Amino acid sequence: MSIHKPFVRSTLALTFVGALALPCTAFAGDLNGVKLPGDHAYPESITAAPDGTLYVSSPAVGGVWRVKPQSNAAEEWIKPGAFDTRSTLGVLVDEKANLLWVCSNDFSSAGVPGPSTVPGSYLKGFDLSSGEGKVSAKLPGKATLCNDMVVGEDGSLFVTNSLAPQILRLKPGSTQLEVWLENPAFEQPPQGAPGLDGIAFGGDGNLYVNTFAKGDFFRVDVKGGLPGKITKLKPSRPLKLPDGLRSTGGQKFVMAEGGGSVDRVTVNGDEVEITTIKDNIAGPTSVVPVGQTLWVSEGQLPHLFEAKKSGPPHLPFRVIDVPMNH
């Protein structure tokens, strides 16, 4: 479904508190990176292939950019609107399936029309070699927003639905998403701001998720491919709009916080140590490790969804590289 205006208003109010207050140094030359083309790029999610090739999405432009290894240029790889896509959010390289997974959503009611008129929320799969669309799966239900995803050991894809307390699953070879887990623990705030967001597997085989507006961090026990106990973990400090989450091995992760930082996340039992790697980033929305480097998308989404209030974005749009041990 398209996002209702009350949802949009409450979302924007929560999403960009802090991001709008970032100092100008967030856009200064202390960070390197890859410039994205145009004055309307607004990168949202970023993923990487094993060879270091980057893929970047955009809710404003749609489609997917590709950045080849050792290159400082982003090229259009998936054309905006291709394979009935619209505004693009989460992206994930699935090496085993040779696919790039892409979340496609309709943000027209938020004043972001996207490159097509396709309504609804979809998970799309594109051939990593050719860029050809291969898989299209509509999110089930009425309240749907495809946000982010992770691949399980058996090749199943697990997807967060940010408008319902659901983790969805797409089994290998299937084109139909199913509700793998639905639980009140993941409920959105009363005003309807986004709930489930980042998702990753830990070295213990369990699933870890965060909630954007509430700033919670959960472990979902997984046994035999089925969900078990849900545990709300205890971060060492409050989380500020936690977003993209990626594993770095064992019980360690990296995470983007919309409040302006990218973090190292270490899970020890029910405790979560949050260590800021880099702050004063321009509205980070996603992060992916490539070797000892973190690539982070500077979303600047307040300037897209609240243009009148926030004014024009800081150009150029970028994805930035941050040393893992910064």
Language model feature labels by segment:
Residues 2-15:
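Bacterial N-terminal signal peptides that target proteins for export
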Residues 30-36, 73-81, 132-139, 178-190, ...:
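A short beta-strand motif characteristic of beta-propeller blades
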Residues 37-53, 59, 82-108, 139-157, ...:
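Beta-rich, blade/repeat-based domains predominating
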Residues 55-60, 94, 100-118, 157-163, ...:
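Conserved beta-strand positions in repeat-built beta-propeller and related beta-rich domains
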Residues 62-65, 108-111, 123, 165-168, ...:
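Structural signal for beta-propeller blades
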Residues 68-72, 127-132, 171-175, 221-226, ...:
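Short loop/turn segments that connect beta-strands within beta-propeller blades
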Residues 114-156:
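Asp-box/WD-like beta-propeller blade repeats and closely related beta-sheet repeat scaffolds
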Residues 118-129, 311-325:
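Beta-propeller blade signature
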